[in-house]
């Protein structure tokens, strides 16, 4: 049993019980020429830096495909997009500006795949079950699983996008099986190779994967630590990975615990407080994990652990291995 200190400030201390299989979706993407896509997809796929929001949406998708994650793709310029651009520029030997300047745009667009594609919804995509997720931990413990609350949330995680963006891209769509919708082209991105080490940078609020030559080849925005539970700086190691974890909840172990709560087992699922994967660190009670709130990554605080979007945490988990160095630095 592994104890952790890494949940959102509204939640409390949990202890990890690992299950073995990740949550998965059936996928069937149909890529089409831009001429066959709705006008918004055409505009985004042909966007130039001067095209403002269309260019930012295209850039976010290309950054995600290049493994410099902007977290939740929403088409809006913000701190996570700037971090992703900074990381991409550094990795590619470009001047670090945090902006979509011409050299950065040209480097991103070496990936010639369309940013937005048409996708045919499958029965598995909309099968659910979908149900509201209670905020109270004791109420969560009464559920069999902490799955998605809506088909839009499920599709948002599948395509690394905010549900609001999917709605904007697909006005009038009912999100029913057999329906074609426009989505970010992220499923076909290459898997990450194994890393030589992992670096967590507090000042940049990022987690990076570094190869044997010392080059950062993937970067993810993160939520980490707080005044009450600071990030445990130092040199640690990866202990292992647990996918689709369930938890034993112990309210006695957190400063913001609800005194009326009791110990309880919190079921697995994407809306579990640590999401769909836990990467265990040699520092007791600490790890890198997913989140039920991808829109808040890089914008809030944690109980000391390192929180990523579920899709970034899953991607990272496939590139690490037991014994790998994990450097947590200021």
Where are the model-predicted features located?
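Bacterial N-terminal signal peptides that target proteins for export
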Residues: 2-14
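Short alpha-helical segments in extracytoplasmic peptidoglycan/chitin-binding modules
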Residues: 60-63, 72-74, 84-89, 151-159, ...
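Bacterial N-terminal signal peptides
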Residues: 13-23
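Compositionally biased, proline/threonine/alanine/serine-rich low-complexity intrinsically disordered stretches
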Residues: 27-59, 90, 113, 117
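Extracellular LysM carbohydrate-binding repeats and other cell-envelope/extracellular binding modules
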Residues: 79-83, 87-125, 167-197
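A short amphipathic alpha-helical interaction element
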Residues: 49-97
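N-terminal targeting pre-sequences for secretion and organelle import
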Residues: 311-330
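Gly/Pro-biased beta-strand-loop elements
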Residues: 187, 193-291, 318, 322
């Amino acid at each position: 049993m592994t104890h952790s200190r890494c949940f959102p400030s509204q939640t409390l201390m949990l202890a990890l019980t690992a299950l073995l299989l990740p949550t998965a979706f059936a996928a069937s993407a149909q890529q089409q020429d831009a001429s066959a896509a709705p006008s918004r997809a055409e505009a985004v796929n042909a966007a130039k830096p001067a095209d403002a929001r269309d260019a930012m949406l295209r850039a976010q998708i290309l950054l995600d495909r290049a493994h410099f994650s902007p977290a939740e793709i929403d088409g809006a310029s913000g701190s996570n997009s700037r971090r992703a651009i900074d990381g991409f520029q550094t990795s590619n030997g470009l001047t670090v500006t945090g902006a979509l300047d011409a050299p950065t745009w040209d480097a991103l667009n070496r990936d010639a795949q369309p940013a937005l594609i048409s996708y045919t919804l499958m029965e598995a995509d909309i099968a659910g079950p979908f149900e509201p997720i209670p905020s109270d931990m004791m109420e969560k413990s009464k559920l069999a699983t902490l799955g998605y609350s809506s088909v839009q949330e499920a599709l948002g995680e599948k395509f690394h996008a905010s549900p609001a963006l999917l709605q904007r891209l697909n006005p009038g769509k009912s999100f029913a099986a057999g329906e074609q919708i426009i989505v970010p082209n992220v499923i076909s991105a290459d898997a990450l190779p194994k890393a030589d080490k992992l670096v967590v940078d507090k000042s940049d609020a990022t987690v990076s994967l570094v190869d044997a030559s010392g080059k950062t080849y993937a970067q993810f925005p993160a939520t980490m630590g707080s005044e009450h539970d600071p990030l445990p700086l130092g040199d640690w190691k990866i202990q292992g990975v647990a996918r689709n974890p369930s938890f034993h909840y112990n309210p006695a172990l957190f400063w913001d615990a609800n005194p009326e709560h009791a110990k309880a087992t919190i079921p697995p699922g994407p809306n579990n407080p640590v999401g769909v994967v836990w990467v265990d660190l040699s520092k007791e009670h600490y790890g890198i994990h997913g989140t039920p709130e991808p829109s808040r990554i890089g914008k809030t605080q944690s109980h000391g652990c390192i929180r990523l979007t579920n899709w970034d945490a899953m991607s990272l988990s496939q590139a690490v291995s037991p014994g790998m160095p994990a450097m947590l630095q200021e």
